[in-house]
Amino acid sequence: GLLSSLSSVAKHVLPHVVPVIAEHL
């Protein structure tokens, strides 16, 4: 379903996004 698609996308995206956000904090 849509939620499972979003969760799978989040699992791929978050590992790349979190370090970038952390650098700017």
Curated annotation (Swiss-Prot):
Main localization of the protein described in the UniProt heading: secreted
BP GO terms, sorted: defense response to bacterium
Reported tissue expression: Expressed by the skin parotoid and/or rostral glands.
One cellular component (GO) term of this entry: extracellular region
Residues modified as Leucine amide: L25
Pfam family, one: Caerin_1
Compartment(s) of residence: Secreted
Matching InterPro entries: Caerin_1
Keywords in alphabetical order: Amidation, Amphibian defense peptide, Antibiotic, Antimicrobial, Secreted
Family: Belongs to the frog skin active peptide (FSAP) family. Caerin subfamily.
Domain notes: Contains two amphipathic alpha helix regions separated by a region of less-defined helicity and greater flexibility.
The name this protein goes by in its record: Caerin-1.4
Lineage, broadest ranks: Eukaryota, Metazoa, Chordata, Craniata, Vertebrata
